[in-house]
Regions:
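Helix-coil boundary and interhelical linker segments in multi-pass alpha-helical membrane proteins
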Residues: 1, 54-63, 117-133
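Juxtamembrane helix-loop boundaries in multi-pass membrane proteins
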Residues: 1-5, 25-52, 68-71, 87-118, ...
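C-terminal transmembrane-bundle signature of multipass membrane proteins
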Residues: 10-15, 150-156, 177-181
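Transmembrane helix-loop-helix
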Residues: 59-70, 74
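Transmembrane alpha-helix boundary signature
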Residues: 17-26, 52-63, 85-88
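N-terminal signal-anchor module of multipass membrane proteins
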Residues: 1-17
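Juxtamembrane interface elements at the cytosolic ends of transmembrane helices
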Residues: 79-88, 116-117, 144-158
Length: 181
């Protein structure tokens, strides 16, 4: 799988950039959509998972560090872009329509940055404690985000009517977010 990921990762970036260049309006609409905006956090998780594979399987610390830095930059940019945009929107959907398990991808993104940072820390020599503190901060921040989001999802499950179609694939992310946390 590692070899496949090394091939698929750049292809996904090329396709993502092509989508931005060819369909700017759709990408902009996705950033402002409560169901799709959080999906952009998958780029952070993918970047850091590949970085983890580089450390564990590929034994390429340099590539892993580059991917970790890219993951941090992507995470920081997306946190401000996605959450700020959704927060300041004038028109907002009701909670039952606006929240789903896909929101937990933001947690998975933060936790993946933390995991890769912890894996890389031993390679930083005297700076290892700094990397570990940063990884801990990311993990704790992701944990807080998990508590906030899962509380809203639980509230939605418990107090709003649900149909089988409401249990679409994004709801299954609930378990993945708990696992990485």
């Amino acid at each position: 799988l590692f070899a496949l990921n090394l091939g698929f990762y750049p292809v996904l970036w090329v396709l993502s950039i092509a989508r931005v260049l060819r369909h700017r309006d759709r990408v902009r609409a996705d950033f402002g959509h409560y169901g799709r905006a959080v999906g952009f956090f998958t780029t952070v998780a993918a970047t850091c998972v590949l970085g983890s594979q580089c450390v564990v399987i590929g034994e390429s610390v340099t590539a892993a560090i580059a991917l970790w830095i890219a993951g941090i930059v992507l995470w920081a940019g997306l946190v401000y872009a996605v959450f700020a945009l959704l927060t300041i929107k004038a028109e907002k959907p009701p909670l039952a329509e606006g929240i789903n398990g896909g929101w937990l991808i933001s947690v998975v993104a933060a936790q993946s940055v933390a995991v890769l940072g912890a894996q890389l820390a031993p390679h930083f020599g005297d700076h290892a404690p700094h990397a570990l503190v940063f990884a801990l901060a990311m993990w704790l921040g992701g944990g807080m985000l998990y508590l906030w989001i899962i509380s809203l999802i639980f509230y939605r499950y418990t107090f709003f009517p649900m149909s089988p179609s409401d249990l679409a694939p994004p709801y299954w992310i609930n378990m993945g977010a708990a696992a990485i946390s």
